[in-house]
Amino acid sequence: MKTGKFIVIEGLEGAGKSSTHQVVVNTLKEFGIHEVVFTREPGGTPLAEKLRYLIKHEVEELVTAKAELLMLYAARVQLVENVIKPALAQGKWVVGDRHDLSSQAYQGGGRGLDQHLMTTLKNAVLGDFKPDFTLYLDIEPEIGLARVRGRGELDRIEQQNLDFFHRTRARYLQLVQQDPNAVLINADQPIELVQQDIRKAVQKFIEENV
């Protein structure tokens, strides 16, 4: 049995990750790929969802940047080992809302955590496991945050200042440029053009890898 492929959707808040899922799924179906598993990070298992709550919501004490990072990796390893790897082994495709690139950008870039720590933790937890394909939806932080604020109450991460998101975006752009399996999508465009670019990118990946 062929193993499945792991596609990840990345981007800042308000970039349109949620609507991208359906475009990816529809494109996979066009190529006869119907067994698709959805994941989100942090989350995706009972333990990981509890950690998601602690990461996203205000709690009774200050959550340090390192504590936040460790909770994210604890949630990630649960999801990878208990959900993603088994699904891929069964030949299913996995479409993930965020993966390790988020931590590298948000905690490594936004929080400014030590790069040696980031790399060491990534290697210890994930080893050589990584997505087969990453769609990075690039958006100006001002535009993305305006969209998010229009939805209502903000979570703990969304409440960070604009400089935090500019640092996060800068790290995203740096890492995406270095990753041959990542594609940058201009999410500042009208939604129709964004979805068109996503469809083309996914089609190209399928044609080259299936």
UniProtKB/Swiss-Prot annotation:
Top-rank taxon: Bacteria
Organism from which the protein derives: Histophilus somni (strain 129Pt) (Haemophilus somnus)
CDD domains: TMPK
Family: Belongs to the thymidylate kinase family.
Family matches, as SUPFAM superfamilies: P-loop containing nucleoside triphosphate hydrolases
Amino-acid positions noted as binding ATP in the UniProt annotation, renumbered to this chain: 11-18
Encoding gene, per UniProt annotation: tmk
Keywords, in A-Z order: ATP-binding, Kinase, Nucleotide biosynthesis, Nucleotide-binding, Transferase
Catalytic activity: dTMP + ATP = dTDP + ADP
Protein name: Thymidylate kinase
Coiled-coil ranges (or none): none
